[in-house]
Amino acid sequence: MVLDKLLYTGYNVSTECGYCKSGRKTEHFGLLAEKLSCEDYQRLIDLGWRRSGHYLYKPNGKTSCCSLYTIRLDSYNFKIAKEQKKAIKKWVKYVNGKPLKPMKSEISTDYLNNAFQTIESLGAEKYSVTMEPCTYTDEKFEVFKKYQMQVHLEKEEEITKKGFSRFLCNSPLFNEDKGIKYGSYHQMYRFQGRLVAVGVLDLLPHGVSSVYLFYDPDMSKFSLGRISACREIWLALECGYRYYYMGYYIHTCPKMKYKATYSPSYLLNPGTNKWIPIENFTSLWNTGAPKYISFGDENNSDIQTAVDYDSSEDSSQNEDDYTLFNRQLPGILSVNVAESLVSENFANIGNSTFPTRHVLSYFPQVKHWFVEINAAVGEEVAKSYTLVLSS
């Protein structure tokens, strides 16, 4: 078995939330991954983790200004919404030059099949959607730069090839089963030979995870976000992936409201790491419930909440002393369980890998790193990583 290679970065407090721009703090536990199996990343996603390049992070919804919930769609039971159909019809008419042929079937998956097969059978010189490795090219970067400048209003000097590569091309994921297409990819959308959009995807054992989408802003009127999401759901269906992961959902963030329109969707319950229909959460939020909600039992009757929390007002503790335990990061293992797993951990020093019993006799001060990582990654991943102490 090839071990994951992780570097400890610990509990982090950011000075500004990237979602609400309120100036209040946001908190997460983070790791750097040199290597991470697709199977273990699947396990981590189902514990509330996400990746940005090689950086892995698990947000703390209890103590952050915005509560981030992992959201996934059951692709096998997808029910297409009116606005999604409208976007697809408009796109098909533009690409094909004529309206989408009506269907008798009301089944959503049949609708996706009809629409995407219609335009993707026109020939590559007209229209194509292809999958390729997530490598850097100048062509991709130019579309990305144009998108960031016009859609996200970033300055040109802030958008670099290095930053693009780090964010959307570099990936720690590896696949031991060479017969199955897992890993990180770019889904390329071309119209009349021109690159118009790129979907950054992680293909995992149980689902397609959408990392990012960027497109030519000249095509903004075609709602390519909706088109790409439906195309990625179709990819999941065609390749046998049960779930479609759309990253995080924040109910108070207007830009994320669209994710709730893809049905049936589920949110990861932060306290129990169980998937619960999104409607169970939104019905409470829409009636004034706090932004952090966790259902405490299988019947969803024991509801735990946290008051709207401003970590900038917490002066009782130095931020350097924060840990995932004293900050009550939801959904982690207890200290006792995490400590019991240390005997099964490994450490990497130089080119050699050692069991922790040898390493801790020389470096006892790093034991708490193993304990924190074990608590955050869960029992299965805790048994399959080596902690890089020096390279």
Curated annotation (Swiss-Prot):
Pfam family for this entry, one: ATE_C
Major subcellular site: cytoplasm
Keywords annotated in UniProt: Acyltransferase, Cytoplasm, Nucleus, Transferase, Ubl conjugation pathway
Alphabetical list of InterPro entries matching this protein: Acyl_CoA_acyltransferase, N-end_Aminoacyl_Trfase, N-end_Aminoacyl_Trfase_C, N-end_Aminoacyl_Trfase_N
Family: Belongs to the R-transferase family.
Organism of origin: Schizosaccharomyces pombe (strain 972 / ATCC 24843) (Fission yeast)
Keyword Iron among UniProt keywords: no
Annotated compartments: Cytoplasm; Nucleus
Disulfide bond positions: none
Function comment: Involved in the post-translational conjugation of arginine to the N-terminal aspartate or glutamate of a protein. This arginylation is required for degradation of the protein via the ubiquitin pathway. Does not arginylate cysteine residues.
Gene Ontology biological process terms in this record: proteasomal protein catabolic process; ubiquitin-dependent protein catabolic process via the N-end rule pathway
Catalysis: reaction(s): an N-terminal L-alpha-aminoacyl-[protein] + L-arginyl-tRNA(Arg) = an N-terminal L-arginyl-L-aminoacyl-[protein] + tRNA(Arg) + H(+)
Record's protein name: Arginyl-tRNA--protein transferase 1
GO molecular function terms attached to this record: arginyl-tRNA--protein transferase activity
PANTHER family tied to this protein: ARGININE-TRNA-PROTEIN TRANSFERASE 1, ARGINYL-TRNA--PROTEIN TRANSFERASE 1
GO cellular component: cytoplasm; cytosol; nucleus
Broadest EC class assigned to this enzyme: transferase
Assigned EC number: 2.3.2.8
